[in-house]
Each structure stands twice: as C-alpha cells, then as structure tokens.
Amino acid sequence: MKRFALALLTLGTLTGCGAPAFAAGAAPRGGAAPEEATRGGPLLADGRRILHVLHRLAFGSRPGDVERVRAVGLEAWIDRQLHPETIDDRATERALADLPSLRMSIPEALRQYPRPDPKLREKAQNGQLTRREMTEMSPPEKRPFRIVAELQAAKTLHAVESERQLQEIMVDFWFNHFNVFAGKGDVRWYVSAYERDVVRPNALGRFADLVRASARHPAMLFYLDNWLSARRDFTVPAGPNKGRKAGLNENYARELMELHTLGVDGGYTQSDVAEVARAFTGWSIDRPQTEGRFVFRPRMHDTGTKMVLGHSIPAGGGEDDGQRVLEVLIRQPSTARFIATKLVRRFVSDTPPPPLVDRVAATYLTSGGDIRTMLRVIFASPEFYGEDAYRAKVKTPFEFVASAVRALGATVDAHAAFDLARATAEIGEPLYQAQPPTGYPDRAEAWVSSGALLARMNFAQALASGRYPRVALDPGSLVAGADLRSPDAVLDRLLGALVAGQTSGETRAVLAAQLTSEEITRSGPDDRGPAKTDIAKLAALVLGSPEFQRR
C-alpha cells in the first residue's frame, strides 16, 4: 500500500506543470536568497546551483559530490567536464576491460560472435542434442547477443562510475539523435563500433563530424536500408539476387533531414527527399556478414544532376554527391534551430525557452556547429539557472537507475552493470533497443504512468535492499550518526542524503505516514532483533518520491 500511495503522489506531481514546490526551509545549507534574472524569473541560489548542475551535466550526485564541486568551484568543474580529456578516468577504463567486444573491429566481432548454426538449432529441436551439448557447442558468451549485452553494461558502468559525466550525458544524447536499432539484422555486430567510432569521439566536438561519420557507418547504412539503395534502373549483377531489379530507398534521406538535421518543420519537400536519396545511391556496405565496411558502389549510383533545397549538385559527382548534400544540410539555419532546440530541451526544459534557443542557434551558425561552444551558452544562461528549471525534467529509466545507484553511494563493476542494464530494460528502456529512428524520447509524458512508476519503486526496493549482490552499497553510511531507534531522524537523514532535504510538504507527509509500519520500524526489541529503522526500505521510498524522479 505504501508504494502505491507514493506512486499516486508521484504520478500526480510529475503530470503537473512546472518545477516542484519545496517545503519551507528545504533549501540546502549555504544557499542564498535568489537574485533576479536579467531574463525571465528568479535565479537559483548558489547551493541549489551545484545540485542543479549535477542533475543536468551528470547522472545525479554521489555522497560528497556537492562538497567536491564547491571546493573546486562550479565554473571550474563545468569547464573540466567540457574537456573530458583532462579528467583521469583510468579506473573506469580498467573496469571496462572485462568487456572484450567493446574493443573489436566489426570484422573481429563478426568472427568472434558468429551467427548461430541453424543445423545445431534443428538438432536441438529434434532432440539430437541436449541443452548442455548445445551450450557447449555454442556458449552464451560467444553468441551475437553478447555484443549488445556488453555494450549495455558498458553504458551503465560509464553512467555510474565515470568521472567524465558530461561526456556520458552527451554520448547518450547523440546516440538517441542518430539512433540505430541493435535488434535489426546485422546492426547487432556493428552497434558497438558505431558508438565507439562515431558517437563517443564527437560527442563534444563538431556537429558536422557526427553527421558525416554517421552517414558512412555500416550501422546507419544497414539500419535505414541505404546500403541497398540504387539508381532506379539498376539490376543486381551477381550473387543470389542476380538479375533482381533494385531501386531507390528514401529511408535514410528522409530521416537525415527530419531527425538528423533540418527537423520536421525544416522547410524541405518530398522532392528534396527523393533528390537526397539519389545523391546517396551507392553508399553501401562491403560484405556485410564478414567485413562490414563502408564501400561506394559506382554502378549503383545515380549520376544525374540533383537539386536539394535550391542547391544544384552537378552530374557525375559520384560519392561526393552525398558529401555535398551533407554540407548543404549542415549549414542550414533550420538545422541550427533544430539542434539548438533539442540541446535546450535536454538541459533546461521540456518546453525550451525561445530566447535561449535563438542564442544557441546563432552560436551554432557562428561557431560552425561546435557542440562545446553551444553548451557553454546554455550553461551560462539565466534560463538554465532559473528556479523554474530546477528539477523540471523527469528522469528516463536509464537516468533513474544510474542516479539511484550514485545517490546511494554504490559502486559497480562490469558484472554488476549487466544486472543494472537488465533492470533498466525491465522498467521501460532497453538500451540500444529503440526501434524507431527517433531514439528514446526526452519528454516527461513518454515516461510517466502509474505502472512505470511502480516498476521504478520495485527497482528501488530491490537495489536498496541488496538484491543486486554485485552492486556494492551500504545504506547505513547515508544515516551515519542518526539514532536508528528514531524513524523521524533516519528519514530526515535520508532526505538530506538523497534529495538534499528538498521535499514538498505533501511528500514529507506521505513518507512520514509510513514510519508507523512494522515493515519500516520496530519500536522495541523482538525476535527479529533490537529496535531499529529499516534503512533500506525507507531509502527505497525516498528514491520513489516525486523529487527523486526529477532532475
């Protein structure tokens, strides 16, 4: 009942508008009265600024993070995060060593994780092989699904443990922007290299480099079917499909404009889609099941003149036709505005403030799409530090899992990360498994429902209670010094540790009402032991509160 009541409160709060209102006196120590913003409403007080930055530029705060940021200075911390190469992250890299597929090229992955032998499967179905024999001949750690499982674990490990938190936020952001679905055919062998070679090195670089690299990568070519796209009169010359008529495929062209660059209202027409598709004919994959490398096939290419957004691309350009299209799209003001809107939505509000979008879009155009420069504009803006932006975003399941582990002060290794990645899938966000090219959404309405919130609370209960044995945590450390015989004292200490003491009066009342439950407290000794408060159960309830669901 207590989880259901809290879920109803959380659901009602998260489906409301604006940032949550906190109880009087709930601001963290060291906070000053808000100063007035030069644009918009009041700004966050200094104490809340650090928490706000840790919730937006990182996957939540760990015990001691606020003090560490205050010691180096907020601006200095942000600057370091914008330059992840200056941050020592060797501990995370050592933990990732247990995930060998992360370092493999596509040809290596295809060799090391071969396709299941259909003959073995047939023998198993006919009873000619036992399950044990099948496992010995095709061990799980060598099956193709292992590639995606290791990548999911790596993403989780990075989010929880990496000191380069902003880089991980941006890797997640750009992967969803340039999404590929790991469950589609050969993409499962390509996806790890895609994130490693396309997304990660460019996450804080130039947008143009992300567009160019994603366009040529086998994962994108396969996912959006461009590797099969050919001029309209092309006939397959050899192989099992010899003599088959191939044709133009517009999938990549459409998503390139609608989702990667211009946006759905970017001013292009169906004619532009067809012309862009013609420009990318022949951009294909060399031997997808053994090599998986980009190849340009001149015989598949439409060599005629193309007209894209009023720009003429002369006949005979070959592979360069696609490159020229990319340059046209990258330079468009519509692209600047679309990317600016998505960045502001990610870091400020589900309803991006138009003045800030305008400034970020202008920065895109003057900086040549430099991501780091655009982020600086956001992180220095009054809109970013506005009171109405504080905890105004609802966490995705992935953000919730990572932030819960971090808030409890837990540590994870690669083995624990597998378990947490599965938990993320169970509460609604299987990593690398978003089927539509939009990737996973970044708006509250996609993630808020009573069922989803109950699933989050069940995870919180399992996590805090130690049901993930490979996750090393000690909930007692969060309430050190508190009298465990006093449920109110324990609750206050947990609220301070997990949500900085900032809860609405309604949340505090709902949580306080649970303190009389025998599941939570023992007022005196009995056969279960001495009087005490169940820290894990109470911590789980705090993790399920509306305040913790927000960032």
For every predicted segment, state its role.
Residues G18-P20:
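Bacterial signal peptide processing site
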Residues N126, R131-E136, L151-K155, V187-T424, ...:
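Active-site substrate-binding loop specific to GH73 endo-beta-N-acetylglucosaminidase modules
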Residues P63-H177, A182-R200, W227, D233-V236:
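N-terminal accessory alpha/beta regions
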Residues A24-T38, P42-D46, L51-D65, P84, ...:
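Flexible, low-complexity segments enriched for small/polar residues
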Residues A5-G16:
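Bacterial N-terminal signal peptides
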Residues G41-R48, L57-G60, G64, R68-V72, ...:
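Soluble non-cytosolic domains of exported or imported proteins
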